[in-house]
Amino acid sequence: MAARQAGPDRLARMRTALLDPLKEVHGVSDKVLMMTLSILFLGAPGQRRRWREVGGSMIAVDTLVHNFLHRTGILARFRADHPYGVACYRPGGCADIIETVAQQIDARQFNRRFPATFPRFVQHAIWRYCSQQGLDICNGNQIDDRKRCDNKQCTLYSNCDRKRLHEAE
């Protein structure tokens, strides 16, 4: 039903229709649902276009992604400071911010087969920028969480607020 009604919030309605019943499963977080289902749906066969659309709209916010948004000052700029957890998925939280950013980026410039708006791609790019398995730049292994980042070689340095993750003791 949610898929049949057009409108700018169509994908959000489809996600909600799919995820809300699954949130009743005790111990399964939004992050786990988004991560698992997005991988499954993005890998759907070509004739399952709606599955791929919904999978591409699912944003999995882990601590690396949340902490990146905090350290760079993005959460503060959106007046969305909050601790990591369920607030990341509330209106105005990390997932909404990434969705907003994704609407400003044409993902087809990276791969012509991508949809123009691809929130999962933006979230994954942030994760890869931070993760040890990726570029290993913006994370607790490289930055003392009690201090501001001092990596002047970082491509984001001049636009980054370089906020501490924790107050210095």
Segments from the language model and where they lie:
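HhH-family (HhH-GPD) DNA N-glycosylase catalytic core used in base-excision repair
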Residues: M1-E169
